[in-house]
């Protein structure tokens, strides 16, 4: 079981982890809003699936229980530790919200989803990436799936 952001970081540095991240980045790439004033946020452990060159920039929020790893590795930090039950955002503020490695590790996933709906704009979109608990990778101890 992955306990903190260091576990995720170490996994995504492996050959298998880099391959998974590349495939997830392709999926997520078209999801982000490209509008000049768009507000895009990712929650969980999103750095492996984010591109530093996204415009407008994406913010990375990590739940407090995982601990924070600064992101991106170069340039101004765009990551923060957050409480999933009280996101530091205004109501109906976000254009896009990505959850990756968030729901499966949250002790109260329904409360996290409620908070997501609170901060999403009426036309906003939510993309939730969760592992298949019946899949082969879910049975492996060395993956976050």
Protein language model regions, located:
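A short SAM/SAH-binding and catalytic strip from SAM-dependent methyltransferases
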Residues: 95-110
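A short glycine-rich, Lys/Arg-flanked "PGG" loop and its adjoining helix->strand segment in the class I
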Residues: 110-125
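Short glycine-enriched, charge-decorated loop/helix-capping segments at active-site entrances
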Residues: 14, 75, 142-145
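Class I SAM-dependent methyltransferase Rossmann-like catalytic core
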Residues: 1-34
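Short conserved AdoMet
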Residues: 33, 107, 121
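Class I SAM-dependent methyltransferase SAM/SAH-binding core
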Residues: 26, 30-87
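A short acidic, Gly/Pro-enriched loop at the edge of an enzyme's catalytic core
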Residues: 85-97
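Conserved class I S-adenosyl-L-methionine
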Residues: 125-145
